[in-house]
Each structure stands twice: as structure tokens, then as C-alpha cells.
Design a protein with these regions (language model features):
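Flexible, glycine-rich beta-alpha linker
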Residues: 17-42
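A short C-terminal helix-loop "cap" of Rossmann-like NAD(P)-dependent dehydrogenase/epimerase domains
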Residues: 29, 45-60, 117-125
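Active-site Tyr-X1-5-Lys
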Residues: 1-22, 51-52
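Mid/C-terminal beta-alpha module of Rossmann-like enzyme folds, strongest
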Residues: 78, 82-135, 174-177
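Amphipathic terminal alpha-helices
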Residues: 126, 139-149, 156-188
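Hydrophobic "lid"/C-terminal helical patch
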Residues: 48-51, 79-83, 112, 144, ...
Length: 188
């Protein structure tokens, strides 16, 4: 409810000309550091980090569980893109559900195994938690035509998600007032 209230407030303030605001609805962003953070979706990052580091991991959702995935790199690119959009051309459109990858846990494990080796699959076990599976394991596919038309994107596929999540890109920054942003995207 609080998210919808903020979206409504930003849209209303932008409509009145009080702010030049934008709101992005973010999916599960991976791969965060493996630290206790209280976030129920942390298992998504923990799975990726454990696999990459060759550590055993007990996944709290089933291999068939589906979730919305985006790398931190892709998320930052989308945030920068939102900041660069011409506010005058946006009109009333100020809220976007970002395009996401809709992947099962097994699809992510497949991509991890392709990069880090099939033998690491044996390090992953499954102990589905019904509550967590209900929250983060049954996400439906998303259609985001408005966001795509505005130039927002996802990681393209599971292999790119793994690469973008676990191999950080060069640092980027937003320009200071009066500065021009020059960004080059390198494909790993």
C-alpha cells in the first residue's frame, strides 16, 4: 500500500509541476552481498553467490519456483536511463514496472552451471518454505510495453543475468549539474 501511495504522490506532484519525478518498480535485484539483511528475497542472491563460490546452499524454494530477476548492473542502467528521460516529454507517465527476466530457479542454476561447472549442481539442495514459495516462487510473466517503449530493459537471458550479477562493470556516475553524461556499455 505504501508503494502505491508514493507512486500516486510522485505522479500528482509531477502533474502539478512541483517535481520532475519518476518511479520505477524494481524486481528481485541480484546479486547482493551474502549478509543477513532481513530481506526475504535474499535467497536469490545467496543462491548465485554460493554457486559461484563453490559452497553448498539449501534453497528455500523449489527448482520450479519462478521469480522476477534483474542484475544490479541492469538496475543501475535503468535508474540512469530514468534520470536522463526528458521530463517535458513524459507527460503524465511517471511510473514504470521495469522489464524483468521471468526465470525459474532451475533456469538460473542451469546458467550458473554453464559458467561455473556442472559439478557444482550437487552443492545445491532444496527445502521449500511454503510461505517464501508463495511470496517469491509463483511470480507470473510480466508484460511491460510502456517501459520497453520508454527504453527500459532487462538482462536479456539467464546467462547474461549471471554475468551481469557476478562480474561488476566499470563504475558509472550521474553528471553533476551542467555536466554531460558519457557512458559506454561494454559487453563482457
Amino acid at each position: 500500500t505504501h508503494k502505491a501511495m508514493v507512486e500516486s504522490a510522485v505522479s500528482d506532484l509531477a502533474r502539478r509541476g512541483d517535481v520532475d519525478g519518476r518511479v520505477l518498480r524494481l524486481p528481485g535485484i541480484v546479486a547482493r552481498p551474502r549478509e543477513p539483511n532481513g530481506l526475504r528475497s535474499a535467497f536469490m542472491s545467496d543462491l548465485m553467490r554460493a554457486f559461484a563460490e563453490g559452497e553448498s546452499y539449501r534453497c528455500p524454494v523449489s527448482p520450479e519456483a519462478t521469480a522476477w530477476w534483474m542484475s544490479a548492473r541492469c538496475c543501475v542502467n535503468n535508474l540512469i536511463h530514468a534520470a536522463e528521460l526528458d521530463g517535458a516529454a513524459l507527460g503524465a507517465q511517471r511510473v514504470w514496472q521495469l522489464p524483468v527476466l521471468h526465470l525459474s530457479i532451475s533456469q538460473v542454476v542451469d546458467a550458473l552451471a554453464e559458467r561455473y561447472g556442472q559439478e557444482r549442481r550437487k552443492l545445491i539442495s532444496y527445502a521449500p518454505d511454503a510461505a517464501l514459495q508463495a511470496l517469491f516462487g509463483r511470480m507470473p510473466p510480466l508484460k511491460t510495453p510502456q517501459a520497453r517503449a520508454a527504453g527500459f530493459s532487462h538482462d536479456r537471458n539467464a546467462a547474461a543475468l549471471v554475468r551481469n550479477s557476478l562480474y561488476p562493470a566499470a563504475p558509472r556516475h550521474l553528471p553533476l549539474t551542467g555536466e554531460t553524461l558519457h557512458v559506454t556499455a561494454k559487453q563482457a
